[in-house]
Amino acid sequence: MAELPLAPLKRILKRAGGERVSDDAVEALRDEVEDRALEMAQRAREYAKHADRKTVQREDVMAARREH
């Protein structure tokens, strides 16, 4: 999978208080974020499909977010 770049995720971990952050930690966060994003995207697609749309809109993503 590995779609997201590591550098921004490392910055997020540091901003959260991680003085030093291992590469393994960054990769683990990337994997988790990608998994959750894919799940949310799939739910958002279902909301769009239910509304007889092919285009996933912001409201679909927000509905999927509330569901989680």
Where are the regions a protein language model picked out?
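Terminal helix-to-tail segments of small alpha-helical proteins
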Residues: M1-H68
